[in-house]
Amino acid sequence: MEAGEEPLLLAELKPGRPHQFDWKSSCETWSVAFSPDGSWFAWSQGHCVVKLVPWPLEEQFIPKGFEAKSRSSKNDPKGRGSLKEKTLDCGQIVWGLAFSPWPSPPSRKLWARHHPQAPDVSCLILATGLNDGQIKIWEVQTGLLLLNLSGHQDVVRDLSFTPSGSLILVSASRDKTLRIWDLNKHGKQIQVLSGHLQWVYCCSISPDCSMLCSAAGEKSVFLWSMRSYTLIRKLEGHQSSVVSCDFSPDSALLVTASYDTSVIMWDPYTGERLRSLHHTQLEPTMDDSDVHMSSLRSVCFSPEGLYLATVADDRLLRIWALELKAPVAFAPMTNGLCCTFFPHGGIIATGTRDGHVQFWTAPRVLSSLKHLCRKALRSFLTTYQVLALPIPKKMKEFLTYRTF
């Protein structure tokens, strides 16, 4: 998909449920996720089941005319041709999913020391957050259950691993807390973060591993230090529950989505509100019942950091360019709940209330040299450090995303 083109539906996965299940209840796909290397896709297909699907999809799921790499390719460095679809029976409704990054060498040594009988942690791990407050940790390659983490008193709504490969996991729950777990130490709970007054809907760790964002039902967004596990600041601006959040790939931006029909883009270092993206009806309506039909469900950044994808209750998937205040593309979808980009770009996955997953084309653009330089610099410079540089004001504005 080129910039400016409408997203095309590439493929759709539908759950194959046993006949004893009621197809109209507990069938929602609350979460979808790609593994960091793009070799696996996971989706909660309802009725306590998570599907692990090797990527790219088998040919029967791909429409004619779409070019996809085969897992049997000679250029496949990780032997993906041998990967098989897995079905994980979690025993409870699954709300949150998160893949670990490939573990760092120190984490592998710690895991081997504390888990001598467990599979090699050089393989991927999937965490699942359940309806009863439990978190189950699975080894992706084999589908084996590795750990059961207990502590939350209500639904575990979201999960996030540190991108560094340290196997630190953060969970967000309806019990109004976030919890920090160290999988290197038998899943030991190392911290409980309190302060939210209502359900915590989501959590996201910045790519540089310095900050944790959490969002909840009391219209608030909290930013925490991942070093000291203390509250840095509260972000205020939404008028209703905040249900989704994501950091840009360089950690310089934070986006939050709310039932108030807006996405707010923040500077997480200063707390400044940079812009708002409003999800209005495409066609005017006289029916007051439709006033809140554009409530947001999910927001995510593209891998290169130039686009956002949002899913709303008005049956639309929207794609936004950072520099514009209106969507650059739309796609019709019914009952959307969540979305995520493929790690290497070009594809968006969305989950729905009926347990289906759809894959859409996403913009593929060659990032400008200016953006690549900004992204590289912001990966290790905070906003305050940029503002302290002896450079022209216009350059500072560009590097801090005040201009594009």
Swiss-Prot record:
Recorded hits in Pfam families, A to Z, give: SOCS_box (PF07525), WD40 (PF00400)
The UniProt keywords, alphabetically, are: Repeat, Ubl conjugation pathway, WD repeat
Q: In which pathway does it act?
A: Protein modification; protein ubiquitination
Q: Where is the SOCS box domain?
A: 356-404
Key word Repeat present in the record? yes
- Enumerate the WD repeat regions by residue range: 105-148, 151-191, 195-234, 237-276, 291-330
Record-linked InterPro entries:
G-protein_beta_WD-40_rep, SOCS_box, SOCS_box-like_dom_sf, WD40/YVTN_repeat-like_dom_sf, WD40_repeat_CS, WD40_repeat_dom_sf, WD40_rpt, WSB_SOCS-box_domain
- Keyword check for Metal-binding: no
Q: Which domain of life is it from?
A: Eukaryota
Biological process terms from the Gene Ontology for this record are:
intracellular signal transduction; protein ubiquitination
According to the UniProt entry, the note on domains is:
The SOCS box domain mediates the interaction with the Elongin BC complex, an adapter module in different E3 ubiquitin ligase complexes.
Role summary: May be a substrate-recognition component of a SCF-like ECS (Elongin-Cullin-SOCS-box protein) E3 ubiquitin ligase complex which mediates the ubiquitination and subsequent proteasomal degradation of target proteins.
Q: What is this protein called?
A: WD repeat and SOCS box-containing protein 2
Q: What is the lineage of its organism?
A: Eukaryota, Metazoa, Chordata, Craniata, Vertebrata
